Amino acid sequence: MFNVTKKSIEWGGETLTLETGKVARQADGSVIATLGETSVMANVTFAKAAKPGQDFFPLTVHYQERYYAAGKVPGGFFKREARPSEKETLTSRLIDRPIRPLFVDGFKNEVLLIVTVLSHDLVNEPDIVAMIAASAALTISGVPFMGPIGAARVGYANGEYVLNPDVDDMQKLRENPEQRLDLVIAGTKDAVMMVESEAYELSEAEMLGAVKFGHEAMQPVIDMIIDFAEEAAKEPFDFSPPDYAALYAKVKSLGEAQMRAAFAIREKQERVNAIDAARAAIKAQLSDAELADENLGTAFKKLESSILRGDIINGGARIDGRDTKTVRPIISETSVLPRTHGSALFTRGETQALVVTTLGTGEDEQIIDALHGNSRSNFLLHYNFPPYSVGEVGRFGPPGRREIGHGKLAWRALQAVLPAATDFPYTIRVVSEITESNGSSSMASVCGGSLSMMDAGVPLKAPVAGVAMGLILEDDGKWAVLTDILGDEDHLGDMDFKVAGTENGITSLQMDIKVAGITPAIMEQALAQAKDGRMHILGEMSKALSSANSFSAYAPKIETLTIPTDKIREVIGSGGKVIREIVETSGAKVDINDDGVIKIASNDQAAIKKAYDMIWSIVAEPEEGQIYTGKVVKLVDFGAFVNFFGKRDGLVHVSQIANKRLTHPNEVLKEGQEVKVKLLGFDERGKVRLGMKMVDQETGQEIAPEKKEEATEA
């Protein structure tokens, strides 16, 4: 009944297994990949014909994590998985980016790739396993895919690269000074296709070394998929790339001159309008059959690409007049919004980001529910890309995959320079509103985010800047690396290579390559140019702000207090009674974590002090010899019980009440009376012994010994 094919190798200290032929047999390609005890299933289906008029490649990738994979039940009212989480969205993009360029040019049939996490051992991250499963499923499906690809995660600890670090090693990268890198790489046998990383100020050489290490480490996986496909692959789908040479030749002859003139215009909107006019002029001269040809859009793109790329390769001139290494003009402004905690307007050429920082308390931390367990994040970065930023009318709604991905890239770039939570106990939310875009808006978000946080008073370890690099690589081997690319250079070029960091090193690197043949020499040149560009941008940013501003008057003030964990129960009280009383009495917000760290927040410093004192009175231990204010709670023949130092009670013996003989404490005291007492010590049972007669009841000061004697004589 089943025709199972199974292959296994030892990889990175774990067993990696690929299996097909038993599950999802009606899919064009189905593979279950297992690393350790983490199993991921990838299923591929594709349409056997393109839709009429289809002028793009409709590839859809869905990565989904099932809670049962880790033995968990989903939260929420419905108790089932709902819309994709941020991690699922980011992993879908992680799979999509390296495989998309490997489909045969001209293939426009719809392809659907669904990747499902079936089992998670809480050791091996499922994203790498998912990429391997997806690659294997595509390779055996028969779809015209020029893979396979391999994938690997690279860490960097104690000067050594580490293959596929454990989940725990990566989960708290910010809190682990020994682990300085989380890099995911995917590529073919001969070329790197995609890199995604966050780092802690690593050098260009260290980052390039990580890429080389990861590419070499994935080679056994690629070989394994090839062996696997030799046994399990279906017949290749009969597809021949369309021949549109005649159509392209006609389009070129009719409109190359006008299109070249349009690309010579330096202002984006003018250039876009001129390109549209050139297209319209060409279309006006085409026959109905040529206009209906589904390859017309491809012919236009090829013409535009040849003009832009040829000018750069042959003369080094870009469409906005810059050479290959120049960054566009930069203007940085801070404190642009009066009532926000921090704000910045970062403008680089025709790309602009308005970035706002808001400081919150522990209540504002994001709770992340993941397969490996719940966690909290005190740094959030949200990226918004409205249609008006590119002068278009379009969809407006919740953030899409691109916005989530760009926001995470900026988050990765900035998280390395954040202060420790113990030094700066605030939740930080950064929102980047892209108000203009002509390339590299995510890197504008990094620059604006750095300025905005410093404007809010966040003590960053160092300012961060980012720059997007591009590449033109021709078939004859000629190439050019471009600094600070425009939107057209991204769209028509061969590489999008974003690098962010401080003066000391790289904090984030993302690379997407559309062609094979990217050599180490090209990557070294790109990293070197990116460093020069980053240093220039940091210099321009420093003209607006070079260090953290004073703290915003509108931000909440927070003080932290660390208590023994065995005292947490006392501060919270039965059913939260004590903590509610503290909040209601003081007016401050109080947040307690399991480690005994208490954050007290309020816009009113007096409220913070009130809450602080109330908590301290509960958790602190009274000191022998100190004087405290208390209240008489009960009178008995042998003395008075006094409540002091929060909820503590102690006995003032009748002989310690006054400097005269008393027959009963009620001669000088009454219940509810406020008194000043000195802690004399503890009896053999640990009970508190208090005294009053040695304390001046008006001033609360201890009476000098000679005064006691005078009082006794009197």
From Swiss-Prot:
The UniProt entry, under CDD domains, shows: KH-I_PNPase, RNase_PH_PNPase_1, RNase_PH_PNPase_2, S1_PNPase
InterPro entries (alphabetical): ExoRNase_PH_dom1, ExoRNase_PH_dom2, ExoRNase_PH_dom2_sf, KH_dom, KH_dom_type_1, KH_dom_type_1_sf, NA-bd_OB-fold, PNPase
Q: Which UniProt keywords apply?
A: Cytoplasm, Magnesium, Metal-binding, Nucleotidyltransferase, RNA-binding, Transferase
> Per UniProt, where does Mg(2+) bind?
D490, D496
Family annotation (Gene3D superfamilies): GHMP Kinase, N-terminal domain, K Homology domain, type 1, Nucleic acid-binding proteins
Q: What cofactor does this protein call for?
A: Mg(2+)
GO cellular component terms listed in the entry, alphabetical order:
cytosol
Top enzyme class, one word, equals: transferase
- Catalytic reaction(s) noted: RNA(n+1) + phosphate = RNA(n) + a ribonucleoside 5'-diphosphate
Q: What is its EC number?
A: 2.7.7.8
Limits of the S1 motif domain: 625-693
Looking at the record, the residues that make up the KH domain are: 556-615
Indicate yes or no for the key word DNA-binding: no
GO molecular-function annotation terms?
3'-5'-RNA exonuclease activity; magnesium ion binding; polyribonucleotide nucleotidyltransferase activity; RNA binding
Give the location in the cell.
Cytoplasm
Which Gene Ontology BP annotations are present?
mRNA catabolic process; RNA processing
Please give the superkingdom of this protein's source: Bacteria
Function recorded in the entry: Involved in mRNA degradation. Catalyzes the phosphorolysis of single-stranded polyribonucleotides processively in the 3'- to 5'-direction.
Q: What PANTHER family does the record tag this protein with?
A: POLYRIBONUCLEOTIDE NUCLEOTIDYLTRANSFERASE, POLYRIBONUCLEOTIDE NUCLEOTIDYLTRANSFERASE 1, MITOCHONDRIAL
Of which family is this protein a member? Answer: Belongs to the polyribonucleotide nucleotidyltransferase family.
> What is the name of this protein?
Polyribonucleotide nucleotidyltransferase
What species was this sequence derived from? Cereibacter sphaeroides (strain ATCC 17025 / ATH 2.4.3) (Rhodobacter sphaeroides)
Lineage at the top is: Bacteria, Pseudomonadati, Pseudomonadota, Alphaproteobacteria, Rhodobacterales
